[in-house]
Amino acid sequence: GVGFKAGVKDYKLTYYTPEYQTLDTDILAAFRVTPQPGVPPEEAGAAVAAESSTGTWTTVWTDGLTSLDRYKGRCYHIEPVSGEENQFIAYVAYPLDLFEEGSVTNMFTSIVGNVFGFKALRALRLEDLRIPTSYIKTFQGPPHGIQVERDKLNKYGRPLLGCTIKPKLGLSAKNYGRAVYECLRGGLDFTKDDENVNSQPFMRWRDRFLFCAEALYKAQAETGEIKGHYLNATAGTCEEMIKRAVFARELGVPIVMHDYLTGGFTANTSLAHYCRDNGLLLHIHRAMHAVLDRQKNHGIHFRVLAKALRMSGGDHIHSGTVVGKLEGERDITLGFVDLLRDDFIEKDRSRGIYFTQPWVSLPGVLPVASGGIHVWHMPALTEIFGDDSVLQFGGGTLGHPWGNPPGAAANRVALEACVQARNQGQDLAREGNEIIRRAAKWSPELSSACEVWKEIKFIFEAMDTL
């Protein structure tokens, strides 16, 4: 005989190990597993562990040349999901040696590379990862982080204000630069390239970079405040992306931008290293995230993509607005917002946090709230996100009836009023609309904005949907 037992394997014999004690160096994953009818949860959980680590579908003789026990993933715990029939959370532990140091790309290729097409599963979703500190220490992380950014910009004690320049496609570079200048001059801290503004026939990247740099220097000189515009360096090749970042650095601007999911983690990590080495802040847009994270039972939850971004590197990341969205999102959104900002986050299933995660001093990332928000949302946003955030009003600035500078001024007045009210002990949740109305009395720009957009009902109680 050949000295080993040939044939197709029963995964749970090898990969389901409920007695396993997880190691501090293991990467832990929580998967939401929906097995095919007739497949027991232990077999499904074990199949996930096998297929995302050392397993293959049949016994191979080269298994004898390695130590499976040292390298295999293990499904160490399975629990049913309450309220769902035939859905389970399977916890899998991976030995650290399965992963290349400092590579988010390799981590994802291993953990989610193959297993999502597995026949024994009807659906699979990666809900959370626990990254061991020994692995985190192999990553640079964000180029600068929250504190360094505040020091660079000299802005403290309040959220930062931004605005995406619209219409996002079709403006010439000169007109685009004009809109940037007007918004910054009116009181915003940042303006932003849209995620799909790269280098198109109507506006090549170099022209846009030049006119935007001119705009922000002019606004800076006139306001005495440091200004920034997120210059989108995303490109078709890594070389071209770095070329654009180099040009931004030569212009002396403070910040560039990248679409990290469409651009890819390898490109993103390269750009983050360049940004730290050259003093550029890095704004991250999450275009394509909903392709991965929108389905409740299949895909990857955004908190995992957020964790991965903190490892790969970025100083800002878009993370939803909470207001005006579905109920139940508030606690879960704040779960991954804190995961981005804080140095340590405690396991809390009510917020979707499956594992306690220490970040061992990796810099934090500022969450960016953007999309469909306006001056009436300001108290809610200030209350929910706190000071360490970027609030972005695209239409909420450029849609002002008097033009861009008054639109920017209205947002700045609303923000300063909310911060002042909060610091004086007022309850933003209950008195929010009143605070905005009072501020509008001495700001015609805000008063006009208040008439265009409607007051919102700010209801805190959320139906959690874990």
From Swiss-Prot:
Belongs to the RuBisCO large chain family. Type I subfamily. Mg(2+) binds at residues 192, 194-195. PROSITE patterns: RUBISCO_LARGE. It is found in: Plastid, Chloroplast. The gene is rbcL. The keyword Thylakoid does not apply. This is Ribulose bisphosphate carboxylase large chain. GO terms for molecular function: magnesium ion binding; monooxygenase activity; ribulose-bisphosphate carboxylase activity. Its cofactor is Mg(2+). The disulfide bond which can form in the large chain dimeric partners within the hexadecamer appears to be associated with oxidative stress and protein turnover. The basic functional RuBisCO is composed of a large chain homodimer in a 'head-to-tail' conformation. In form I RuBisCO this homodimer is arranged in a barrel-like tetramer with the small subunits forming a tetrameric 'cap' on each end of the 'barrel'. The record marks 325 as: Transition state stabilizer. RuBisCO catalyzes two reactions: the carboxylation of D-ribulose 1,5-bisphosphate, the primary event in carbon dioxide fixation, as well as the oxidative fragmentation of the pentose substrate in the photorespiration process. Both reactions occur simultaneously and in competition at the same active site. Heterohexadecamer of 8 large chains and 8 small chains; disulfide-linked. The disulfide link is formed within the large subunit homodimers. It comes from Drosera filiformis (Thread-leaved sundew). It holds the Pfam family RuBisCO_large. GO terms for biological process: photorespiration; reductive pentose-phosphate cycle.
